[in-house]
Amino acid sequence: MWQEAMRRRRYLRDRSEEAAGGGDGLPRSRDWLYESYYCMSQQHPLIVFLLLIVMGSCLALLAVFFALGLEVEDHVAFLITVPTALAIFFAIFILVCIESVFKKLLRLFSLVIWICLVAMGYLFMCFGGTVSPWDQVSFFLFIIFVVYTMLPFNMRDAIIASVLTSSSHTIVLSVCLSATPGGKEHLVWQILANVIIFICGNLAGAYHKHLMELALQQTYQDTCNCIKSRIKLEFEKRQQERLLLSLLPAHIAMEMKAEIIQRLQGPKAGQMENTNNFHNLYVKRHTNVSILYADIVGFTRLASDCSPGELVHMLNELFGKFDQIAKENECMRIKILGDCYYCVSGLPISLPNHAKNCVKMGLDMCEAIKKVRDATGVDINMRVGVHSGNVLCGVIGLQKWQYDVWSHDVTLANHMEAGGVPGRVHISSVTLEHLNGAYKVEEGDGDIRDPYLKQHLVKTYFVINPKGERRSPQHLFRPRHTLDGAKMRASVRMTRYLESWGAAKPFAHLHHRDSMTTENGKISTTDVPMGQHNFQNRTLRTKSQKKRFEEELNERMIQAIDGINAQKQWLKSEDIQRISLLFYNKVLEKEYRATALPAFKYYVTCACLIFFCIFIVQILVLPKTSVLGISFGAAFLLLAFILFVCFAGQLLQCSKKASPLLMWLLKSSGIIANRPWPRISLTIITTAIILMMAVFNMFFLSDSEETIPPTANTTNTSFSASNNQVAILRAQNLFFLPYFIYSCILGLISCSVFLRVNYELKMLIMMVALVGYNTILLHTHAHVLGDYSQVLFERPGIWKDLKTMGSVSLSIFFITLLVLGRQNEYYCRLDFLWKNKFKKEREEIETMENLNRVLLENVLPAHVAEHFLARSLKNEELYHQSYDCVCVMFASIPDFKEFYTESDVNKEGLECLRLLNEIIADFDDLLSKPKFSGVEKIKTIGSTYMAATGLSAVPSQEHSQEPERQYMHIGTMVEFAFALVGKLDAINKHSFNDFKLRVGINHGPVIAGVIGAQKPQYDIWGNTVNVASRMDSTGVLDKIQVTEETSLVLQTLGYTCTCRGIINVKGKGDLKTYFVNTEMSRSLSQSNVAS
């Protein structure tokens, strides 16, 4: 098995290299794959079936020979020819069953089989009796038909072989019979009839081959599309899982994924959700965890000196390093708030050493910042606080999901950081108990620095770093970066140093197709770019992605080709029944039978062409009687009407007048193409007419034509030579009898041209026809055919005896057409199955793509999501953008802190969070309104809602806009704040609460960017953001506080503002602030809620 796999891989590689391009510069990989597909799916099974049919026919001929009791010495040539042919075909059959030999000697096998069949035909013609004009026409017609339909010739070679076959038969017969004395008056008509039969066989065979090749090409294309969709689906699923898991922990990600898929699948899922008045809450309680809060001291001052790119790079590198430290210490990063970082140990699986993990992480963070400070000379430090307890963790709201934690213990951990000291890890007494003496500590006195700690009587400690007393050699000298500090800004020194850490970029794995082949959805290490030294490798990977995709597609195609082997369709299939070829899925079977068939009119056309050939043949050889004219005239009118109805749609498009009759014909044409029952009815009528007309006039032979004295076979010597001559002359007048048999064969072929019509229907029609024809040949008209053969031949062989030749020929054609019909039915169903699978997988891909987009847009604004979804090398770089005018809003519910309690009644705070989830979800609902399409939710911080406007504008276009238009988004933000107030009032009425919203708004320049590879997060930074936050924290309940600059803009937009006065803002000094008119707020918010 492994040798075969290696052989296939070498074959794939070699052929792929050969297929890299042709003379016209186009890839040729599809050509050789299609050849292989065509070879194994069509050519191989058909040539196997042909050999089985021929060998079976040889055995049947031998059986018939001995059953008839013919003398061996009279038919030596027959007994030599048939067993020899049987041996040759059996040897070829053995070789054909060896796949490798078949592929190498495909053309040779085709040529040998064709030559052997032609040789058999001439041997049958020359031996067994006198040569007649109708001799072996059925056998050569069989050769012509199978050359097109079953031998693996291309169309050109098939035409050449068939023309040689038919022309050689015509020429040989003409030469032989022209040299024979007597009986030449009908020779020309018989030869012409033979030519018409051969032309009909060529046309039917070429038609069959052309349509089958088109169908196979379509099946191949559908197979390729399905495999491509499967590869893409696998990629999308892996990408979606990675994306989801990069945003949310696995234990809630799958629940939320199921809800999104339900939402994307349409109204049915929505109807189920409407029965619940509450939004789903994805929050769980976890006990015995430790929470770490860390703040970079001095970063605000450093950030004010940074360019947008430097700021985002620094944050990404710093927090990327912290994520790495968190992973090493079994901690989960929760969120990034500006320059604040917090994480938890003990989620989602409880860990006994959670406190040690957090303390170790805090020490490592301080050590990492110390290295940065020592290496760059930039005055930054780390303040870390750790507390242990219980948390509620999960996601709230409908948009911009961010995994978060809530509880009194989380609040305490936050204050542990605020009450800490730079460079130290500040822990609570609870955490100290969990450490079990693992670290030395000293008094922390946190209650002196933070009133919350003092109010709650929290005893705090500082952890003594075990490495603190062991100084590294670096402290003995100033690094080169510091020595050069006078020559470059601190931010430049920081950026250059942090680049050496090589933190992964956000969403770096989104479009790496080399991740497609990883197992179990694991991200390979090659997917994570580590620093700029990998840029060249990334470029090479991107250039080779298409080639790898082609290789994977080719490999999957080879596997599919292996699955579509000659024997596979006869074995058990998951989708198709073995014998009947019906689909196991009843719905699929119904859909298949109801499939529209626009090509049906061409089937009828080809059948009518065969009918016309039968008519020409019988006109050439039959006596010209009134019955002949009337019968074919009536049949012609019926078929012409059917043909007209089928083509009515195309014919009437040119007609300007639309009479009721024309409209009925046009409608009928569409019904025939689109509905199965009219097609079935017309198929039965058309084939029945042709099959009946093949033998109809045989029943109207005159008595003189039907009765022939058996003189040639009599032993009475009293008959004179003149009587024998009369008998022969009468027999010659019945020269048309074999052409009834050939007309029957053409009638059977007419059934096979209805390629996509029900296989069982065609089989039933041909079976009834075969039984009827054999009844005529062997019973009702047996004496006529038998007497005719005995008059012409003294001891006729099997192929000279009309009854035997007719019955055997019809049976061989019946089996051949049955095999072709079944083969065609199988691949038609396979094509339908592939299309159905492709359609379903296409829908699943679209769902996955939409899911990925929803997930990405749940983290990023739409225009930023497009940046990462775009397939370009720029995705490898960090996204950052600076804006000159962005309006930032912080809306908080201070009362919620008092409302939040942890008790058994409210499930330890879970029910409080359920209400908060409803509030945030209702706030998020407003974002879907068209008037608020420009509002971008940034994040929620506890019960505070942060949003911004002006982020969707192209920065370069900000200055080109008119002043009023430039500030329109600030008015939109105020309107949004009004709407939030109205939503909260509505929630208060339903929940019997009295929450008040406190809003702070500011506008100005900001820097936007995406940071973090583990959990990518879109955020905005800058003084504008800090002041907006202060506008909220220093604000008044039920008021919207804005800065003086923002109030001036709002007044130009028609809003009224009331001066609050001068207030002291932490870090900004004294600022003059304003309240937006709350009466306007109240009226507008109520109208928003009503709308």
Swiss-Prot record:
Residues 905-922, 990-993 are annotated as: Interaction with GNAS. Glycans are attached at N713, N716. Its cofactor is Mg(2+); Mn(2+). PROSITE patterns: GUANYLATE_CYCLASE_1 (PS00452), GUANYLATE_CYCLASE_2 (PS50125). GO terms for biological process: adenylate cyclase-activating G protein-coupled receptor signaling pathway; adenylate cyclase-modulating G protein-coupled receptor signaling pathway; cAMP biosynthetic process; cellular response to forskolin; intracellular signal transduction. Binds 2 magnesium ions per subunit. Is also active with manganese (in vitro). The modification Phosphoserine is found at S491, S544. One of its GO terms (cellular component) is cytoplasm. GO terms for molecular function: adenylate cyclase activity; adenylate cyclase binding; ATP binding; magnesium ion binding; manganese ion binding. This is Adenylate cyclase type 2. The lineage of its organism: Eukaryota, Metazoa, Chordata, Craniata, Vertebrata. The gene is ADCY2.
